[in-house]
Amino acid sequence: MTELKTLRHELEREILQQGYSLSSFSHTSGVNRGVLSATLNSSTPRPISINQLDRMNMALGKPEGWLYELFIEECLSLEQKPNWRRVRPLIVRCVELQRSDLIDRILYLLLEDPSYIDEVFCLAENLIQKEEKLAILLYRYVIEYERNSHSERLVVSHYRIFKSLIGNNIETNLKAALTFAPYRNLLPIPMQLDALLKLANIYYSLQDWAQTINMADEIYILSSKVYQLRMQARQDQRVIPFLDLERPLVVYYGQGLLLKCAVYEQEEMYDKAQVYVDLFADLQWFEDEHVDNQYYIDRFQFYSIIHTMNLELLTGKEQGLDRYLQILEQHPQEVLPSTLIILEAANKYGYNIDQLLSRYEDIIYPADILDYLIAGSKARYNYQDVTIGINRYINLYYQLAIYHCDRNIYDERLEKILYTLESTIERYNRGRIMDCLHLFKKLRQLTGSLEK
């Protein structure tokens, strides 16, 4: 007995068991009587649509998705060439029902014929905003069956999957970045800029300074090229090409510079860092009709002030600390990254920052780090991943422990710091545990001296 007969016979048997005639069932289900007759009684049954099957299921009191497995086999296994007009509504309906198992079966059968890859890709693009998890399943099949290794749909599929994998675990993000990175330069320009920024954030959170610099350079070069093309088009009185960027172009341009500044700060190459501070300090020349262009120009000017003060503290100029604290009072969103820099400078030069640590204890020890960072990530000015904040907290607790150790303080504060450091690393970045060996050695020396 074929699968088609099984689907027809299952429907026919259930209709008869519930006492319906064709006329009464047509009235109850809303399916045309002629369609029912052609489907159930004809020697060459007429294929039904997924919408008609849903109506029959509802009339029979069956759960949503009843007989879908048999419908799939009829639709895809028995027809010589599947009809996309039947298959597309079927996939959409399976998405609505969250039936990834059925979608998996549909795609397996459908993509034996590679001519359907483009239809599957376009459907995934339509679904990505509302049903990301199931759209990703479609992209995975595009990747599996696409034969052209340089096709745009293949590269975009890799990018969509990469974006979906980025989360709060730094090690998981690294795996996603390593898989996607080879495709980044094949993306359309708008996606390429966003992809480069995401990759840069991942590498920065991993403290992979060389790769962060590479991504920052690519962001700067590409955003500069786009800007030049826009200006040339304006000069030639041509229509400026529209780019559907996630953020204004100045964000990418400025972030390419800011990332290099931040890396050189970390590598203690302070003269180089200052060069890039000067470059993003004044971007008033950057023309863009985007409504938020001026807002971000002002943000980069503000960041130049912050990083200038960072460099002063990191080069031993303690007199700038009071002004820094005044600015933090007005801009509490900068407390986390700034406190980390101030702690590093304090540990390097012996500054006393007890007042700062006491003032911002609620930010240093939030009830839930992730909730605090996610809330901050929704701010208008924020374009960094949450993982950068997580890594800052790990570094913050590490520097805090050193700060208290250097002052021979072993009390409940240090216990709290060590516990929070350990739990944060365990949850978000277990690879950092080796970095703490020096700290633990220092703690053993401290506790040993106190016991004596």
Predicted regions and their residues:
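Helix-turn-helix repeat elements of alpha-solenoid scaffolds
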Residues: 92-103, 127-140, 165-179, 209-238, ...
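Alpha-helical scaffold segments of alpha-solenoid architecture
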Residues: 253-384, 394
